[in-house]
Curated annotation (Swiss-Prot):
<dbReference type="GO" id="GO:0005829">
    <property type="term" value="C:cytosol"/>
</dbReference>
<feature type="active site" description="Electrophile">
    <location>
        <position position="96"/>
    </location>
</feature>
<keyword id="KW-0324">Glycolysis</keyword>
<dbReference type="InterPro" id="IPR020861">
    <property type="entry name" value="Triosephosphate_isomerase_AS"/>
</dbReference>
<dbReference type="InterPro" id="IPR035990">
    <property type="entry name" value="TIM_sf"/>
</dbReference>
<feature type="active site" description="Proton acceptor">
    <location>
        <position position="165"/>
    </location>
</feature>
<comment type="similarity">
    <text>Belongs to the triosephosphate isomerase family.</text>
</comment>
<comment type="function">
    <text>Involved in the gluconeogenesis. Catalyzes stereospecifically the conversion of dihydroxyacetone phosphate (DHAP) to D-glyceraldehyde-3-phosphate (G3P).</text>
</comment>
<dbReference type="InterPro" id="IPR022896">
    <property type="entry name" value="TrioseP_Isoase_bac/euk"/>
</dbReference>
<comment type="subunit">
    <text>Homodimer.</text>
</comment>
<feature type="binding site">
    <location>
        <begin position="225"/>
        <end position="226"/>
    </location>
    <ligand>
        <name>substrate</name>
    </ligand>
</feature>
<dbReference type="GO" id="GO:0004807">
    <property type="term" value="F:triose-phosphate isomerase activity"/>
</dbReference>
<comment type="pathway">
    <text>Carbohydrate biosynthesis; gluconeogenesis.</text>
</comment>
<feature type="binding site">
    <location>
        <begin position="9"/>
        <end position="11"/>
    </location>
    <ligand>
        <name>substrate</name>
    </ligand>
</feature>
<keyword id="KW-0312">Gluconeogenesis</keyword>
<dbReference type="GO" id="GO:0006094">
    <property type="term" value="P:gluconeogenesis"/>
</dbReference>
<protein>
    <recommendedName>
        <fullName>Triosephosphate isomerase</fullName>
        <ecNumber>5.3.1.1</ecNumber>
    </recommendedName>
</protein>
Length: 241
């Protein structure tokens, strides 16, 4: 049985002091979480040490928000697996729509990040998703297929999470219908060809829709943005029914 992964992406939010305060409130709310799931938070790089130094660290895992495909070198503003592992990081988000959009990340670059993450001992959370225009033109399946085939080439599906995040649903308040999201997640699973690969949904996930999302057969977790910034909201999501 696939284990659910409930992940929060804080993006460029939370100072170290704010992260510490958040954890003090959040940790007690997930201490009795069911053992069929795990909780992951991707804080800003500056706040990662706040997590790794927290006494209740066993209750959740840490993810980075990106990763480079080299361990060191002249790569300004990048961060390497070696640096992250030193702070107890277990996961790395790659291919999120924001770096794809703002920094023109290609599927080839995303693939290099994912492959190097795995070879370094991290589990990549590889994001895929279509724009509203692509969806309205009936191109969603083709776009997702390309992103999966190119972005996941030579990766190990047993140490991989794929997050389906329709770009038009991220931070907009618009949520992809659960059945529609499940169809795309089913497509991703078939493309990968490994039934046990963990597939998440992301895009305006909130306490009021988490139960329906997680009732879908091919959705194994969620990648949460804004709702993960509030400890009570994210705890409700993590403790879905």
């Amino acid at each position: 049985m696939r284990k659910s992964v409930i992940a929060g992406n804080w993006k460029m939010h939370m100072t170290c002091a704010e992260a510490k305060s958040y954890l003090e409130e959040f940790i007690p709310l997930i201490k009795n979480i069911k053992d069929d799931r795990k909780v992951v938070i991707a804080p800003p790089f500056t706040a990662i040490s706040t997590f790794s130094n927290h006494s209740d660290f066993d209750y959740l895992d840490i993810s980075s928000q990106n990763i480079h495909w080299e361990d060191q070198g002249a790569f300004t503003a990048e961060i390497s697996p070696k640096m992250l592992l030193e702070h107890g990081v277990s996961y790395a988000i790659v291919g999120h729509s924001e770096p794809r959009k703002y920094f023109s990340e290609s599927d080839e670059q995303i693939n290099k990040r994912a492959v190097f993450a795995q070879s370094s001992g991290l589990t990549p959370i590889v994001c895929v998703g279509e724009t509203l225009e692509q969806r309205e033109r009936g191109e969603a399946d083709r776009i997702i297929t390309r992103q999966v085939e190119q972005g996941l080439e030579n990766t190990d599906p047993s140490n991989l999470i794929v997050a389906y995040e329709p770009i038009w649903a991220i931070g907009t308040g618009k949520t992809c219908e659960a059945e529609d999201a499940n169809k795309i997640c089913s497509l991703i699973r078939k493309l990968i060809g490994f039934d046990d690969v963990i597939i998440q949904y992301g895009g305006s996930v909130k306490p009021n829709n988490i139960d329906e999302i997680m009732s879908m057969s091919d959705i194994d977790g969620v990648l949460v943005g804004g709702a993960s910034l509030d400890p009570n909201s994210f705890a409700r999501i993590a403790n879905y029914k």
